Amino acid sequence: MATQTVENSSRSGPRRTAVGDLLKPLNSEYGKVAPGWGTTPLMGIAMALFAVFLSIILEIYNSSLLLDQISMN
């Protein structure tokens, strides 16, 4: 038989630790979703600004955007 059941094993379930007790409140809202869009527009704005930042860095790196104060050797 491929499977075996172990009865009266020494393992008695998960242990309680100090770190687990500290992190427990963070997991208490698991599965609950607030109705509506929430902070989605704010995240969209942050992503757009980050994309603009990355494109500026890429243009500086490719020397398509020349700045007088920055010398690229």
Swiss-Prot record:
- Keyword Plastid: yes or no? yes
Q: Which domain of life is it from?
A: Eukaryota
Tell me the residues on which Phosphothreonine occurs.
3, 5
Alphabetic keyword roster: Chloroplast, Membrane, Phosphoprotein, Photosynthesis, Photosystem II, Plastid, Thylakoid, Transmembrane, Transmembrane helix
Q: Does the keyword 4Fe-4S apply?
A: no
Q: Which SUPFAM superfamilies match?
A: Photosystem II 10 kDa phosphoprotein PsbH
| Region (Disordered) residue spans | 1-20
Q: How does it sit in the membrane?
A: Single-pass membrane protein
Where in the sequence does UniProt note compositional bias of the Polar residues kind? 1-12
Q: What does the UniProt record tell us about how this protein is modified after translation? A: Phosphorylation is a light-dependent reaction catalyzed by a membrane-bound kinase; phosphorylation occurs on Thr residue(s) in the N-terminus of the protein.
Q: Where in the cell is it found?
A: Plastid, Chloroplast thylakoid membrane
Q: Provide any one GO MF term from the record.
A: phosphate ion binding
What does the entry list under GO cellular component?
Answer: chloroplast thylakoid membrane; photosystem II
Q: From its record, what is one biological process in GO terms?
A: photosynthesis
Family statement? Belongs to the PsbH family.
Query: Any idea what job this protein has?
Result: One of the components of the core complex of photosystem II (PSII), required for its stability and/or assembly. PSII is a light-driven water:plastoquinone oxidoreductase that uses light energy to abstract electrons from H(2)O, generating O(2) and a proton gradient subsequently used for ATP formation. It consists of a core antenna complex that captures photons, and an electron transfer chain that converts photonic excitation into a charge separation.
Q: Quaternary structure per UniProt?
A: PSII is composed of 1 copy each of membrane proteins PsbA, PsbB, PsbC, PsbD, PsbE, PsbF, PsbH, PsbI, PsbJ, PsbK, PsbL, PsbM, PsbT, PsbX, PsbY, PsbZ, Psb30/Ycf12, at least 3 peripheral proteins of the oxygen-evolving complex and a large number of cofactors. It forms dimeric complexes.
- What is the name of the protein in this document? Photosystem II reaction center protein H
Q: Which gene encodes it?
A: psbH
